[in-house]
């Protein structure tokens, strides 16, 4: 089955639309967010397991009941083997190491969870097709977007989920408002600001939105506030 094509503007709309339905005030200012409230809001159930012993997969979206292999601990030792479990439809499975980690891990968890939510919202048509798998597994590389090949189905699906997650977690107007406040800017700059001068402001803004530095940097570059 062909993957549906969406422009980045359309994907941003999907992110904003979920905010409008979930909590429209998030569109204008940074607010605390429990991403698992979003999971429940879209009709899914969260679960946490050690998906791999090397954390190569951080999240899984389950589109129908299916067997799946998980591990008893997050570190491989000789003689260890995975065990089979049954994952139920509507499950968003997150690697337990993210839920057990430090602040930075929590920020990665936030992006991973919302990324998986958008797989569920946008891509059921694809994964419920008998020709395709019943689950979508997402690696840290795919979440960061560095390896994505937009001439492949999976690369396109990952880009779409990434873009929507960024728009949901870092809404355009809210990011502009908060960044300009942090940087004490009275007006939107006519030219993007130099990255090296804005790093501390990027870090502070990222903290407000509970995301890591790089996702906020990319978002601000996309908006046109800082140089690429």
Show the residue positions of the predicted features.
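Active-site hotspot residues in diverse enzymes, especially metal/ion-binding acidic/histidine motifs
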Residues: 1-228
